[in-house]
Amino acid sequence: MGNKLTNISTNLKSSWLTAKSGLNRTGQSLAKAGQSLKTGAKKIILYIPKDYQYDTEKGNGLQDLVKAAQELGIEVQKEEGNDIAKAQTSLGTIQNVLGLTERGIVLSAPQLDKLLQKTKVGQAIGSAENLTKGFSNAKTVLSGIQSILGSVLAGMDLDEALQKNSNELTLAKAGLELTNSLIENIANSVKTLDAFGDQINQLGSKLQNVKGLSSLGDKLKGLSGFDKTSLGLDVVSGLLSGATAALVLADKNASTSRKVGAGFELANQVVGNITKAVSSYILAQRVAAGLSSTGPVAALIASTVSLAISPLAFAGIADKFNHAKSLESYAERFKKLGYDGDNLLAEYQRGTGTIDASVTAINTALAAIAGGVSAAAAGSVVASPIALLVSGITGVISTILQYSKQAMFEHVANKIHNKIVEWEKNNPGKNYFENGYDARYLANLQDNMKFLLNLNKELQAERVIAITQQQWDNNIGDLAGISRLGEKVLSGKAYVDAFEEGQHLKADKLVQLDSAKGIIDVSNTGEAKTQHILFRTPLLTPGTEKRERVQTGKYEYITKLHINRVDSWKITDGAASSTFDLTNVVQRIGIELDNAGNVTKTKETKIIAKLGEGDDNVFVGSGTTEIDGGEGYDRVHYSRGNYGALTIDATKETEQGSYTVNRFVESGKALHEVTSTHTALVGNREEKIEYRHSNNQHHAGYYTKDTLKAVEEIIGTSHNDIFKGSKFNDAFNGGDGVDTIDGNDGNDRLFGGKGDDIIDGGNGDDFIDGGKGNDLLHGGKGDDIFVHRQGDGNDSITESEGNDKLSFSDSNLKDLTFEKVNHHLVITNTKQEKVTIQNWFREAEFAKTIQNYVATRDDKIEEIIGQNGERITSKQVDELIEKGNGKIAQSELTKVVDNYQLLKYSRDASNSLDKLISSASAFTSSNDSRNVLASPTSMLDPSLSSIQFARAA
């Protein structure tokens, strides 16, 4: 409670001093007011009832008042009760601090004494001047009253007003009443902020006593609904009536000019017929003063009053209450999930909106009054006292109200703070804002449950593990800033769920997800043989957060974020065949950004994965990755994301399945973790909170290196990749792009994918599939198999040694066209795509033209096979080409296909081919996680005696 009082008193200090400073600058006439009050009937008198007793030994408040009054030049008089009664009769203000009598302005000593004896007020006023003694408190109060009266009553001839009971006296009484109200409001603000609506109501009632302002008084009196029980939504809706204008103001896409127009309409409704009422009042004063009230003068007054109304102020109020209404609706769902923070935020918006609406309505009306009076008084010496009086009153009210808003706002924020602290007290060990993230996650889970329950079928996995990163939430950030609890808020929270057979399981016993230590353990697979680990949203880097709130200015604070980072994620798999898509795991950290938001300095988080048993698939992300495939047939995919071309050189590797993958990621946009700043405002107080989140940021090019162990197959990127195989059996899939693939030694399986690729099988019995694009294929030494399909484009094959085969896996042999073009054999399918076997006829032609020529090369493919297993040998091709003068006739091909002996030979050869390629993998390069990523299967259907080569989708 002490801290609360200190905070409020500090705000009061600022408000009081600023008000005094502002009043001292209101003009020369106001500056002279204090001196004029010390002479004649304008003097201030401290009245002490004759029978009022006080203990001089205890040094109570009244003694301090007397001493302070004497020092300030204020007359001190003890009077009989009947003299005090005169003051009460004059204005009925003996219960107030101030009264007005024939002798001057009366300060009621008992009332001031009571104020100073209130502990809270004494503390507040004392702390405002850094004083603790009663004398100083008394002096502060009296000097403040002098300052206010100096402005309110500047330029007034009180002697004449008291004698004639003129209109000016009515205004003087109203000014004095307003001053009384303001003094009470300031003196009791420590305990009456909740009742601010009532204060406004009282002020409205007092304004009704001023001739011509009854309409304004009625409107302000209507603000009494702004108390802590109703908090203003209904009242403000009534006050800010006018559906059309309200809709315009609520429209975020409405233009400024349209909002201004709507604001004028709305403002006129707020103050009723304020222009008319104030104009009539001012014209009446001019008549009383014997001044002109002609049409042009009236028009000048009315236009000046209208211009004094600020429409945009009311636009802001409408927006604030619309926001509160939206928050209330939004909060309903999360309240059911155990989080009431959005409702607290709505409560804050309603509370501060109430204050804003009240102050803005009053200031708007007062500005209209002051503007109209100034217009009426233009060029008139007689009317100057009225203008000065009204300007003084409106200036005092506006200044004090405006600079009291911060204390009022902080009071509303303190209530929010206390509710959060109380919740955490009643829920030991829990964090209120973390509870907010929990509720957000549960709502997200509910919204997506149907989709998630269908993932087992979509991903064709017995178990699906879904990891969700709940990232920074602006509402939670606002609440943390408003409540001054930014040190407790988190940047987000990660959650894990499991799904089996369309059922949602508790994942805490199946999966270990520790974001603080960087651990993801999915090895407890139970009876599940296949599982898919899906990162639904970008997962932030591992580590722990700590925040520190520091003050950077009078009202400016920043909550700095300090991160104790862990340099890697450690992933552990078990016996199941698992698929990991790591492209949504954030590995790049933007340490420094330029003014445009481009990353200029980065840090990397490594991923270390131990896959265990099973046939696993890993889709690599943007940073360094170490993978130990363990047992089973494991594939590493680089086909998702845009993380640079691969360069693999395994020529010196000493273990099968070991590769070093170098990547260069060119400049562009990629997923980064960056630190941003959230800003929340509480009146003048600005709270900045640092938080981290993921975002696609522009970056410079960078290198990264992956280490693979016990990996059976690598799928490349959409860039131009380079693969150099080992001396062992390699399986490379180039993916998209113009790839260069060299199998080196071993029996390799090489697939080009899309693009015009260059593939060299090297030594060994290689399986080569160029894929789509115009590819250059070289078998090298060994018994190689080439594959071509319709839609693959125009391929060129160079072959030298071995018993080689070419399969047109989706074309009938008799539908192909064979012809000799120069030294080459060109085979054309029904799509007019050509496969050119380079130098097929070169050796034979050399033998014909060069005497005693001995062939040194075998550039032919020994068998060419159709989709149903039908085939033609190189010998048959030569014979039929020669017979057909460079082209095989269609009838001759038909005979080959129909020949029984060839078919029998085809079946025998198919059995041999089946043994050769039965271990070949089904190549995959799909970006669709729903594809079946199967284990290796035979690619021969013996029942059809046909070769069926699986390909990338």
Curated annotation (Swiss-Prot):
GO cellular component annotations of the record: extracellular region; host cell plasma membrane; membrane
Membrane topology, from the record: Multi-pass membrane protein
Note: The lktCABD operon has a complex mosaic structure that has been derived by extensive inter- and intraspecies horizontal DNA transfer and intragenic recombination events.
Function: Pasteurella leukotoxins are exotoxins that attack host leukocytes and especially polymorphonuclear cells, by causing cell rupture. The leukotoxin binds to the host LFA-1 integrin and induces a signaling cascade leading to many biological effects, including tyrosine phosphorylation of the CD18 tail, elevation of the intracellular Ca(2+) and lysis of the host cell. This leukotoxin is a major contributor to the pathogenesis of lung injury in ovine pneumonic pasteurellosis. It also has weak hemolytic activity.
Notes on the domains: The transmembrane domains are believed to be involved in pore formation in target cells. The Gly-rich region is probably involved in calcium binding, which is required for target cell-binding and cytolytic activity.
GO BP field: killing of cells of another organism
Protein name (record): Leukotoxin
Transmembrane feature ranges: 230-250, 297-317, 359-379, 381-401
Residue windows of the Hemolysin-type calcium-binding repeats: 715-732, 733-750, 751-768, 769-786, 789-806
Cellular localisation: Secreted; Host cell membrane
Pfam families in alphabetical order: HemolysinCabind, RTX, RTX_C
Keyword Secreted: yes
Family: Belongs to the RTX prokaryotic toxin (TC 1.C.11) family.
InterPro entries in the record: Hemolysin-typ_Ca-bd_CS, Hemolysn_Ca-bd, RTX_C, RTX_pore_form, RTX_toxin/Mannuronan_C5-epim, RTX_toxin_determinant-A, Serralysin-like_metalloprot_C
Signal peptide residue numbers: none
Principal subcellular localization: secreted
Post-translational modification as stated in the protein's UniProt record: Acylated by LktC. The toxin only becomes active when modified.
UniProtKB keywords: Calcium, Cytolysis, Hemolysis, Host cell membrane, Host membrane, Lipoprotein, Membrane, Repeat, Secreted, Toxin, Transmembrane, Transmembrane helix, Virulence
Alphabetical list of PANTHER family matching this protein: S-LAYER PROTEIN
One annotated GO molecular function: toxin activity
Record gene name: lktA
